[in-house]
From Swiss-Prot:
SUPFAM superfamilies: Release factor. GO terms for cellular component: cytoplasm. It comes from Bacteroides thetaiotaomicron (strain ATCC 29148 / DSM 2079 / JCM 5827 / CCUG 10774 / NCTC 10582 / VPI-5482 / E50). This is Peptide chain release factor 1. PROSITE patterns: RF_PROK_I. It is found in: Cytoplasm.
Amino acid sequence: MADNSTILEKLDGLVARFEEISTLITDPAVIADQKRYVKLTKEYKDLDDLMKARKEYIQLLGNIEEAKNILSNESDADMREMAKEEMDNSQERLPALEEEIKLMLVPADPQDSKNAILEIRGGAGGDEAAIFAGDLFRMYAKFCETKGWKMEVSNANEGTAGGYKEIVCSVTGDNVYGILKYESGVHRVQRVPATETQGRVHTSAASVAVLPEAEEFDVVINEGEIKWDTFRSGGAGGQNVNKVESGVRLRYIWKNPNTGVAEEILIECTETRDQPKNKERALARLRTFIYDKEHQKYIDDIASKRKTMVSTGDRSAKIRTYNYPQGRITDHRINYTIYNLAAFMDGDIQDCIDHLIVAENAERLKESEL
């Protein structure tokens, strides 16, 4: 069990900041500054959770002290029994609450609360890889549905035998990036393809990238320097070709502040039959792309401090294998293996993500030395 006074000192040190923010977020001048207001309301929510935990922690310590006092001085059997029960309950809850508080005190990934851009691409394996990319898309669509998140396809390039060579989606909801970020990496599938006549098991792969969606004030873009083109397209997936040019393509020259190198960014959006909406979504993807690149140094810095990488680092790393003949899923980052592949592919992936979160939290606690 942690030293009670150390945890209380840390919590007490945050009371003044919580009171300061409580006042600031009602200030009209702060509310008018959208960037500052959003940042402060996020900090307020985090500190509010800590203040509630602090209140419970002080209550538990008080309960234990009062119960000890009764047991030392009270002769009435009923009073002593009630005091012992109160002390046992409080002592049982205290270590769990301490762990919760420690995790709350460790700085969280500032991106976790953001929405996300989900990119799935068929890799090695030709048609079968594209089909598997389609299976992963369906898996994530089902998962998003269970979470109450909204998923919208921005762009899709269908495979010749089904599935997708590439599909890009935006996902909006509560703490989307903080949960989906664990899916970034290479997903490998072992199964007999529908096109296989000899019944042989093939290995194919698809890559998944999950990027925190940037807000307008996260990056600076000179919209006057964007070159726009329009073209005819269908809805998501490219079917039903329009007679109007609703698809949009943007080109933007961006200089990487970390390297000083200029590069051209090309983004297409065919999500809707409404050109202004497609422009808006293409801009959102441009902001996210630049934000992701500019924050790569931040991600690399975190990666260099950790011995085991769970949610950040190399997106080309093989993270999970889907073995159909055995009905097995193996996540290689934490040696997690289960044999419910059908349910997993139907969107039941939360348990795996929970195990990854536990592993990452353990790393965060080691870093903080709390």
